[in-house]
């Protein structure tokens, strides 16, 4: 594991996204709460948050980070859903692996819960879209832009 003890604490934010292709009928079943395993998107959000919190146990050389925020957002479209994970910490190293793990596990949960009704699902385009680092002092003087909520789709 890399030694980060000489690095100063800073506010770190990472945003990861991915897509899951779903049949239109599957999306209808999800929206009507007709999937046998339960509320698909609520379960996926919780699974993604839990997974982000467990990243250091899943990826051997990742540092254990004190996460101050993990948010999973799911936006549907005609052919599936785009899942976004926002992770935030005040630490000496980045939080991108937590965001990537969160978004991936959220999509795998959707896959698991819908596999009985949709044999053509496909997970794709998992990527890091934002990684920021702000000085810790920015939190106290109002300069920290990472505090805003990320709801709009990012390019």
Over which residues does each language-model region extend?
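C-terminal binding/interaction regions
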Residues: 1-41, 46-61, 68-150
């Amino acid at each position: 594991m890399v030694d980060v003890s000489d690095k100063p604490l800073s506010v770190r934010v990472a945003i990861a996204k991915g897509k899951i292709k779903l049949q239109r009928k599957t999306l209808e079943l999800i929206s009507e709460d007709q999937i046998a395993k339960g509320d698909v998107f609520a379960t996926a959000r919780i699974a993604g948050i839990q997974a982000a919190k467990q990243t250091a146990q899943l990826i051997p050389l990742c540092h254990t980070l004190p996460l101050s925020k993990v948010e999973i957002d799911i936006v549907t479209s005609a052919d599936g859903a785009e899942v976004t994970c926002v992770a935030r910490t005040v630490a000496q190293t980045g939080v991108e692996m937590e965001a990537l793990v969160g978004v991936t596990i959220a999509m795998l949960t959707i896959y698991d819960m819908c596999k009985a009704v949709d044999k053509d699902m496909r997970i794709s385009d998992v990527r890091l879209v934002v990684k920021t680092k702000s000085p810790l002092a920015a939190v106290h003087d109002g300069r920290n832009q990472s505090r805003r909520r990320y709801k709009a789709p990012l390019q």
